[in-house]
């Protein structure tokens, strides 16, 4: 690149930086590609773990960044993005609890805030041209800062493999802990961790034990079940085993407890936003328990029509979050519309954890519509079974008329 004419028009860029191979190569690439351009690294702490953050500032500076901002977003992620999303019942394609998708808007928002703080005229990400994340990040940038230029090196540079990136860094004497033998592509945050690539790209290959990092194998989990009590107020988890906890703290406690019982593993082939299918193995131990607890209370407090409507909202919300459309009027509308039902979701649930399963075995709510008197098969004074006759006749009226018309 040094022999080529450098691009102009970008004086300061904020890079979403992880310290991994891709973003380590992006810093020198930006300096070589853009004339007199200052690189500011930005890292979002979304609960990926201390090991991922250790030495990150020093590594960014050594790679050529002028500064590295590490922003703690853990509490905000869980309280303002995860909790509202799961309150709608959002599950992508029936199984995926949207771990990566929910984290992208808050990361993009914080990146824009850093860009404004330092006076940058561009933002940069390390997403590949085949994945969903490029759309998610750039969709958020468009909504929050349409004036900022977006740089996506994977759609520009000529490097196509890990080996290319390693050679690029070696030529510039930039140290990296990455190797050409890396097996899996992983993305972690407080809610989950995803595993892709390697032998997982063949859907005929069963994931080995080495794939999973947050959960034990269900067959190796304790032979004795563990019971966890969860308190819920207005669709939000407030207590775990009687202890009042912040959203992030509650998730961390449940991650540890549920992970020890092998809870929260899924292996799916999903439809990506960009049109192709991809296989992903996901671990969401605490989130799986939270979801089970919320659904248990919903079963008690939501009438049939409300529950059907909530499922419709959840399905639409899942696609919206997966597709990276958080900062839109539709997202605001869905979250606002789901809140009246979430306000009814109050109660206490006991979840049984055993060999990879999380089952609600006890539940109660002050808003419960369930009545043992009405539901009993014994004699009662509150329900006259003869009343059902007229209801059934009216309920089946259309079928009756259709049958009579067909005979005539």
From Swiss-Prot:
CDD domains: ASS. L-aspartate binds at residues 128, 132-133. Pfam families: Arginosuc_syn_C, Arginosuc_synth. The gene is argG. This is Argininosuccinate synthase. It is found in: Cytoplasm. GO terms for cellular component: cytoplasm. ATP binds at residues 16-24, 44, 126.
